Amino acid sequence: MSAEELVASPKLSKEEKKARKEAKKLKKAEKAAKEATAQEGVATEEVKEEVGKKDKKDKKEKKDKKRKEVDQEEAESPSTSTAATEEPPKKKKKSKDADSSETPVSTATPTESETPALSKKQQKKLAKASAAAAATSSAAAIPAPTVPTTFTAEHNTFLTSNNITLTPSLFPPLLSIRDLPINSKLQPFLNKFEKPTPIQACSWPALLSKKDVVGIAETGSGKTLAFGVPGINLLSQLPPVTGSKKGRGQVPGQIQMLVLAPTRELAQQSHEHLSAFGEQVGLKSVCIFGGVGKDGQARELSQKDTRVVVGTPGRTLDLADSGELDLSSVSYLVLDEADRMLDAGFENDIRRIIAHTPGHKEGRQTVMFSATWPESVRRLASTFLNNPLRITVGSDELSANKRIEQIVEVLDNPRDKDFRLTHHLKAHLKVHPNSKTSPTRILVFALYKKEAQRLEYTIRRAGYAVGALHGDMTQEARFKALEAFKTGQQNVLVATDVAARGLDIPDVGLVINVTFPLTTEDFVHRCGRTGRAGKTGKAVTFFTGENHEKSLAGEFMRVLRDVGAEIPKEMDRFPTTIKKKEHGSYGAFYKETSNAPAPTKITFD
């Protein structure tokens, strides 16, 4: 080789050659990923990030620096760098003119045969991300039905009379079910209801307009249909999305609506309502919860017509992490009884579940319902909801139902509870006799499982048809007890607080709190099992002032005063101070920061 050729094509070290080859491979891989994404019709940021992260992990800092140097040399002299990176064929020398006239490789457009194939793992990620993006984009592409935006005097009267606050006031309440702009196949199911409840009337216009909503309302206010009607209506317009084949040989349909609930009983109840409503348009709902085997639930999820899932956070996260539940196409997410889920310690599970779903930028609509509006719920809403409309029916503080008659009996001796219990059972059934056509239902609450078992035995010995509902029972036994109580086979049900929240048991005429719960929140939700759907009810509470009850006396009396209930004079001997609530982990020294910014996710390469 002549001196001129040496100058034109300087000899490079092995490391520099290797770095240039890596740079070429990286450019080709990026170009191939872009072409594959263009063929799918989707160019999402997630695909770019995944491909970029995969490539960056395989490169060291030293190679990155050398690649930058090579790129600079190519920009200055493309023909020289191209000639240097190409190995000349054996037994054949290239002239200087031939080298300079050759087209640089770095600027050439690769053909299909030259494009390097992505790895199987990258192809799977690309296909999954493309399918999810297509599903959420189709949800966003569906136009929202037209709803009125002008408030009339009738609307303002409705809001005032029901003590409803809209923040901000964008949509007036929908006062007639027949005015709902929904799928015509769904309308006959709703026509059996005379009129919407306050939370339904205010939620439907905003949710049908594809807005995120936070609903704060008392238990028994019809929240299931408040979020269920817009969700099922949206899915009735969306095409089903088929997932990829899983390791067990199952081909599951991807879920498009996810509802999270704090307890198995509430999840089962919401599932029943959504199943009945979804049947009108051929949608199937699956309920997933712990306490039973996963295999049966996984088989149901694998059915192609399964598009709605109602579940508890623990089992939902378990199935999502194992790949048996695909949440990448969820376009409608509901957090039901959000305050209860946070109280039960499910916040981390909820955050991990939401991480499996698309973001609101990809078209996901998020709905959150709660009985109260504490700081923990506000923080969760600010993180995952996009400029939500907040609907408050009544107060956002804890308050009891004013339609429930409250009777408080202060007992000096806890042993008097059994006698007073049987007295109230007999008195109530005398006024409201039990019959097959009009069963009388009485709900008795105990604090602990052993106490529930003892009370069940005591009531049965007194000659009443009684069942039980507590944590030591199998899931099958719990279902049977609930069904017997709902159908009237057993008119008395003894339960722990596992049944105190969210259960919609029709026509519960009397609630008896044998032992006061550990919090006033649980007291309100226990009493909320009666007086539902606009009806009246009655609650009897035995109060002894022992153990935890003394410290809750002040808050208990505040709840009674708010609903205008009579407070016995015997309560005067208990302190009226309302104790500051303590954080479960940090105690009384925990500081809530309502204006704290949302957490930022930081990724380290």
UniProtKB/Swiss-Prot annotation:
It catalyses: ATP + H2O = ADP + phosphate + H(+). Residues 204-391 form the Helicase ATP-binding domain. A motif (Q motif) lies at residues 175-201. Its main location: nucleus. InterPro entries: DEAD/DEAH_box_helicase_dom (IPR011545), Helicase_ATP-bd (IPR014001), Helicase_C-like (IPR001650), P-loop_NTPase (IPR027417), RNA-helicase_DEAD-box_CS (IPR000629). The keyword Nucleus applies. GO terms for molecular function: ATP binding; ATP hydrolysis activity; RNA binding; RNA helicase activity. Keywords: ATP-binding, Helicase, Hydrolase, Nucleotide-binding, Nucleus, Ribosome biogenesis, RNA-binding, rRNA processing. GO terms for cellular component: nucleolus; preribosome, large subunit precursor. Its EC number is 3.6.4.13. ATP-dependent RNA helicase required for 60S ribosomal subunit synthesis. Involved in efficient pre-rRNA processing, predominantly at site A3, which is necessary for the normal formation of 25S and 5.8S rRNAs. This is ATP-dependent RNA helicase DBP3. It comes from Cryptococcus neoformans var. neoformans serotype D (strain B-3501A).
